Amino acid sequence: MAKGGAKKAAAAAARAAANRMLADNRQARHQYEILETLETGIELVGTEVKSIRNGKANLRDGFCLIRNGELQLHNVHISPHTHAGNYFNHDPLRTRKLLAHRREIDKFRGLVDQKGLTLIPLSLQLKGSWIKLTIGLGKGRKLHDKRAAEKEKQSKKDVKAAMERY
């Protein structure tokens, strides 16, 4: 009976390792009000996959555009792989194609064109052996909106702390 428990624990640990966060754009959640999210695939070359798995991706300045009916990821820096020669390495800031269903792309295109919203990369995560990018439909926050959101967050934190004390 003890062996079965060890196998289950090992399997759970393997699943947790297979589904992990590789990069997070925390700044985007501060600068934008995220209205909707979408998980997409991302077209990468081998050295980019190795660099992302090593945590060498920066989503902070990134944005997404819809061109020719395709989602494209711009200005996301993925560092060159250290153990590959310069000839085989990738361009760190190249435009990358995102993989999503046609109806999802059309839905986001309508929202971006109509309301003046923007598409922002939020996080890179590993799902099994696939690297997925979560993008968000965001509306830019003004300075007073950021302050109000920070104040609301702090008040929720205070209420939670007070509830735990009693």
Curated annotation (Swiss-Prot):
Coiled coil: none annotated. One of its GO terms (cellular component) is cytosol. Residues 146-166 are annotated as: Disordered. InterPro entries: SmpB, SsrA-bd_prot, SsrA-bd_prot_CS. GO terms for molecular function: RNA binding. It holds the Pfam family SmpB. CDD domains: SmpB. GO terms for biological process: trans-translation. The keyword Cytoplasm applies. It is found in: Cytoplasm. It comes from the Bacteria. The keyword RNA-binding applies. Required for rescue of stalled ribosomes mediated by trans-translation. Binds to transfer-messenger RNA (tmRNA), required for stable association of tmRNA with ribosomes. tmRNA and SmpB together mimic tRNA shape, replacing the anticodon stem-loop with SmpB. tmRNA is encoded by the ssrA gene; the 2 termini fold to resemble tRNA(Ala) and it encodes a 'tag peptide', a short internal open reading frame. During trans-translation Ala-aminoacylated tmRNA acts like a tRNA, entering the A-site of stalled ribosomes, displacing the stalled mRNA. HAMAP family: SmpB. Belongs to the SmpB family. This is SsrA-binding protein. The gene is smpB.
